[in-house]
Each structure stands twice: as structure tokens, then as C-alpha cells.
């Protein structure tokens, strides 16, 4: 079998290429999932051609099971159809089947599925929060959150995370369950997603206090999931937002992993679908260009600041960071009622998603271009933001 070499994304190691379909390898040390892959189709593929390809995969996989006893591979699992055109699927295939798929001229690339996780790093109960006051003030140290009374009303926020406690008093009936793409437990059994949702749109803790929340579960009780499952959640949010009017929708992803072209492409598809997407930069104190989906340039990537307007010690940085937002010692909702304090870029990102919902509620245009509006409104106050990193901290423009 002949192999040729082609250029591949910088963050990925050299890999096999067959008839134009790249089989991408993740970096050393990344926790890949054995025999699980994400297959992304060529740009512009029609639904008819995609259905034909999927039928071929299923037929070929079944024949392999019968004729060759291809282990206990389960074949195709998830199918992705973003409204802006990205199509693909994930599944459990042996090496020979993946090589057969890679021979197809209609395949753009194949990527090994890998683990992703939440980006929160510590927890402390029942201490005061400061993030809201900082978003509504030009100076640090405030205790009052100033905001327009529209407060994101009529805007839907998709929180792609561990799920959301939709019955929590913070949401006053404004939260609904969207879907579960990781397990069979339709609740937030971790707490991370509820905390994030509270920062986006909680009555007490939220930036956009009247926005609606849709909980999309892609991470399990341990705060862990896979790129393939996360992409399913992203696809759901994009398609659901299209039904409801994408211009009045925002999404938040306080999660991430090592660089993944498929994850980045899915994030770009959300933006292309007209949905504003905020993503946590990551908590490894490294360049966020190494992480996904934080490294996707068409979304809004958020680093974490401290109460003293410094870079949080854990926060990733770099040119892909669009803005800073409060992320150290943030109080928000926890499942079952009450509150808890978490730190991380996971806590910074929902401040930006909430601000996006808030600004749409005041009449500003939504979609990915809203990130530019947020950057233009931000104040340049972050000390030591990191090499090549913006020093801008978000502000809601209240004038206080």
C-alpha cells in the first residue's frame, strides 16, 4: 500500500495519508481512546453523498465482522451534520477499517478520539464573589453590579458542560435540559455545569439574569468526556439555535483538551452558524494555541483574571486569547441549591458568554462578530497577561 506525505496542522504530529485523507496523530502524552476515531468529510459534501458514504461504512464494517472477525468493534456511533456544512462521524473501528475509510476521496481527515475535561481547578464553599461587580465597573474592588434591566431577556445560552440543575432557584424556570451525549444520567452529577450556568444567567450570580439556559451534557460525573461526544453536543446546540434564531443564541464551553482539528472545526461550525461561542483558554499556564477548542480563531477564547486584575497563575495565555474575565474564586450555583466557589478559566468563560447574551439583549448584533464588540468594550488593565497576550478585561459598558 502506497503512502505519501502532505502538510498537516502544525499542532499535530506527522501521520499516514492515503489518497488525500490525512490520518492525524495527536501529540505524545494525550489520552486517546483505543480504536475510536472521528472522521470529517470534505467541505461542501451533499447530504445525499454523505448518506451514501455512511451506508458504505456500515456495509463494509458488517462484512468485516462476519468475514474477518474484526474484534468487537462497534462501528459508527455518532453522526455530525452542522447546518453550515461540516459533516462527519465517530466510531469504533480497527486499523484495517480505518485504512479503508482513509482511501475514500470524500474524506478530509481522520483523527483519533481523545479525552477532554473541565477547566476548573479548586473549590471552596460559601465565600464572597467579586466577578460580577468587576464586569460592571471600570475599577476593581467594587461590590455592586451595574447592568441594563434588559439583562439578556429573549436570549438562549447553551452551556455545553456536565449538565445543568434546571430546577435550581437561580434559574427561576428559565433553564431547560437540552441533551445528554456522554452517559445515561440526565442530571449534573458533577456540579461544574450548574456553576457555569449560574455565572451566565443566574438570578443572583449571573451576568445575563433574564437569559434562558439550555443544559447540554457532554462530560460525566468526573468531569470527563471525549472529543466525539463534545462534538455531538456542539452539533445539537448549533441545530437547536438555528431553530430558535441563532442571532439570539450564545454558547459556552468551559472544557478542553489537547489540540484537536475536529474539535476546532466543530467550534468554527458553531460560529459559522451565527452562534457566539465563548471557550475557556485552559488551566495549564501554557500557550492556549496548544489546546482545543480554545485555539480555534473564529470563537472567543477567554483567560482568567484575579480580583487584583492580574493573570490567574493557572490561566493559559497567548495570541489566541481574546479577552480576560474573572476566574479566580468565583461564587455561583451548585446542584441541589445554594452555591459554591470555583476557580479556573472555566469560571472566566461564562462571564463572557453571559456578557454576550446581555449585549444581545440590549440590541447589539449577535454571532461570532460579537467577540470584536466585547474586545472593543474591554478595559486594558491586566498586569503581566503573558507573552503575546492581550491585557483587556471584559466590561459591560455600564459607565460605572
From Swiss-Prot:
Q: Which GO terms describe its molecular function?
A: serine-type endopeptidase activity
Q: Domain Inhibitor I9, which positions?
A: 36-118
Name a biological process GO annotation.
Answer: proteolysis
Which residues are glycosylated according to the annotation? 252, 396
**Top EC group:** hydrolase
Q: Hydrolase: present as a keyword of the record?
A: yes
PROSITE patterns listed in its UniProt record:
SUBTILASE, SUBTILASE_HIS, SUBTILASE_SER
> Is Kinase tagged as a keyword?
no
Q: Where is the Peptidase S8 domain?
A: 129-400
Q: What is its EC number?
A: 3.4.21.-
Q: Which UniProt keywords apply?
A: Glycoprotein, Hydrolase, Protease, Secreted, Serine protease, Signal, Virulence, Zymogen
Q: Name one GO cellular component term.
A: extracellular region
Would you indicate the residue range of the signal peptide?
A: 1-20
**Active site positions:** 161, 192, 346
Where does it primarily localize?
Answer: secreted
* Pfam families noted in UniProt: Inhibitor_I9, Peptidase_S8
What domain of life is recorded for the organism? Answer: Eukaryota
Q: Where in the cell is it found?
A: Secreted
State which residues form the propeptide: 21-119
* Functional description taken from the UniProt entry: Secreted subtilisin-like serine protease with keratinolytic activity that contributes to pathogenicity.
* Family per record: Belongs to the peptidase S8 family.
Instruction: Please state what the protein is called.
Output: Subtilisin-like protease 7
